[in-house]
Amino acid sequence: MTYQAKPARFDAMPYRFCGKSGLKLPAISLGLWHNFGDATPLASQRQMLRTAFDAGITHFDLANNYGPPYGSAEINFGEHLRRDFRPYRDQLVISSKAGWDMWPGPYGTGGGSRKHVLASLDQSLQRMGLDYVDIFYSHRFDPDTPLEETMGALASAVQQGKALYVGISSYSASKTREAAALLKSMGVRPLIHQPSYSLLNRWIEDDLLDALDDTGMGCIAFSALAQGLLTDKYLNGTPRDARINRPGGGSFKPDFLSEANLKHVRALNDLAQARGQSLAQMAIAWVLRDARVTSALIGASSAAQITELAGALSQLSFSAGELQAIDQHAVEGGINLWHKPSTDQRP
């Protein structure tokens, strides 16, 4: 049956300007990092994408190496785009990234060289069946490549018509400022930064948000649910179907489930219940409490999860007392897998 998007899909979704640009992003965006590779049935993926778009989620975020295996998320998304979303292309913001390991040999092992970045973009466009992406990111800072070379590659992507906007991900505040200045000198304004940010990973509050404000860049926070830790999944032990028990679940480390972390998670869950929200809904609302955060990037393994998370939008405000109580448990949890590139180090 031909997909027909819901006519009222935009009504309940807040759309925020991305930094000082004219582009608006939905308050909640859908990331395809997990659950859109070949291990997930296409029918399940299709249901998730339809549910998201019908809820007003107009931004789908990918990267060249999303899967598993690498590249499969983009291939599968291209199929869904062809079958369901081609008539809605101009209502979508589609992004991809390059910078992590992708293909064999010295030019595919990641980084920020012009060779790797632009070859990756061409491959991504081919996999998705697109002429351009709306946003193209440098996926990580590369200390082995001059920043001017990496930003030059991003500028070329815009100048060649292969990307409308460019951004960076997991860059430190100082490198963000440098990157923004370089791009502006090349006639391309940096649009957005994509850092990890959650109740248990607050590093961007130190100086990155200020850097984004100063440079006019938006912020889309990924891993806002700490890869599922900030949901009800682990409140009473580890379920059998948890990512930590699945092939390809290596990004979720056993250390994340420390007793200290679980103690804070349970306390945060109690605070969420008092607000009439699930823990996941409160975690999303909390990330969005700062106006400098344009969008919260969610992952999901089912359409029902997307519907639940979209429910966070019904209560985005917090009282001063709630924020004070949350701060007692919104502490560093040792879950930032992207700490090294975010501090200018080699991964």
What are these model-derived regions, one by one?
Residues 1-92:
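N-terminal binding-site loop/beta-alpha segment at the start of enzyme catalytic domains
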